[in-house]
Amino acid sequence: MTKARTNASASPAVGRNMVINGAMNVAQRSASVTGIGASTILPTCDRWIINLGSTAGRVTVTQTADGPNGISANCLKIDCTTVDTSIAGGEQFILEHKLEGQNVQRIGKGVAGAKQVTISFYVKANAAFNFALEFFDADNSRNCSKLFATTTDWVRQELTFPADVDDGSSPFDDDNAASVRLFFWLHAGSDFTSGTLQSGSFANNTNANRAAGIDSILSSTDNNFFITGVQMEVGP
């Protein structure tokens, strides 16, 4: 069945946040978990998942009352407890958020009038790192990634992803399955870093281009990463 294609310019929802629990205030399942590593998919703060693949490194993940003033009392903290000194090609460490198709229709993906999307968030770390945020279209296996930098102070990042216009791929499914997956890449092997970051536009997925240019949270037991205040809105 061919999905109906409509003009997205009529959407009234510009500016509304599509991320649920971006302030990391709710952690009903896992407020604190230690020794996370190997190949693991683990819920942390509600709607957020730790997704690791084949790494020897280990981390502790906690909901922490250390959010930036005026933004959120809480944040998610990831603390490296065991380093990974020999990185295999297929390794990955991702903080993931899924968005249901019925909640992202306002983007108008793949149709005339498709919208840009801006994702903003607050981050800090123990040092300066480059990590990546990937906007992954799970319905069509298309993606676009952006690098962002950390400092030792809370910094607001604002990353604008281009409209994925009518290119022959389909709109997002209008249902409760995950159509958009936000991947915060914190560590990756060469399978995901050996290409050129797919940053200027959306394209059919090539793994080597998903996380090129990132550092590794697992390079030292001194390393930590904090995030909160995540928002995703239509528009630049």
Predicted regions and their residues:
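Extracellular and organelle-lumenal recognition/adhesion modules and their flexible linkers in secreted
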Residues: T2-P236
